[in-house]
């Protein structure tokens, strides 16, 4: 027997005044989905355990029967594997976004986010942005000194590989939670010495 699993990740959306305070899903003409719901089983599930931030990465593991407490090590490793990025067992993989920040004077950690995905940057623009960053001698030296490298993709999603990194005891905020507000709110929290390599440049 074959099963089709349809996950409406984020499909519910939010209520819109222009739709009579209905969500787009409530207002949509979706007879096939309504028929499946009528003939199937409709229920509520909690796919993100209370100890985890609510996100599709954790929810999808849970939906597929994988215990997040056992298997979840962050969004980065799963996405990198899906992109065909090969790493060693001793590597730590972090998802990094290209983003837009306020263009004003002041300390970096006090500046706010404008867009968590740099306006959905993609293609050659995304590749050029990362190439410009890593070509900077200071950035290149920093990455080398901390045994790090950046693996690029033609999207706003990039991946930081930290070879032999030790981040136990650190909490990393999901990057989409950083909009809006000062960027320091998404700096790693916990052991300051361990956090330093991730916020140094």
Model-derived regions: residue spans:
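Active-site nucleophile/metal-coordination loop of metallo-enzymes that catalyze phosphate/sulfate
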Residues: 2, 12-138, 161
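Glycine-rich, mobile lid/loop segments that gate access to catalytic sites or pores
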Residues: 117-201
């Amino acid at each position: 027997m074959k099963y089709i699993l349809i996950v409406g990740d984020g499909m519910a959306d939010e209520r819109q005044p222009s739709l009579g305070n209905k969500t787009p899903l409530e207002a949509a003409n979706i007879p096939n989905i309504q028929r499946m719901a009528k003939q199937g089983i409709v229920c509520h599930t909690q796919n993100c355990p209370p100890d985890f931030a609510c996100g599709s990465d954790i929810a999808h593991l849970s939906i597929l029967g994988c215990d997040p407490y056992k298997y979840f090590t962050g969004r980065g490793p799963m996405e990198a594997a899906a992109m065909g990025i090969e790493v060693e067992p001793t590597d730590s993989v972090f998802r990094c976004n290209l983003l837009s920040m306020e263009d004003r004077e002041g300390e970096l950690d006090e500046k706010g986010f404008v867009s968590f995905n740099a306006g959905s940057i993609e293609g050659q623009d995304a590749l050029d942005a990362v190439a410009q960053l890593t070509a900077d001698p200071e950035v290149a030296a920093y990455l080398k000194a901390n045994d790090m490298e950046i693996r690029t993709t033609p999207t706003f999603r990039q991946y930081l590989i930290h070879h032999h990194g030790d981040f136990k005891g650190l909490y990393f905020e999901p990057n989409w939670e950083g909009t809006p507000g000062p960027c320091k709110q998404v700096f790693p929290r916990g052991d300051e010495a361990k956090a330093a390599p991730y916020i140094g440049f």
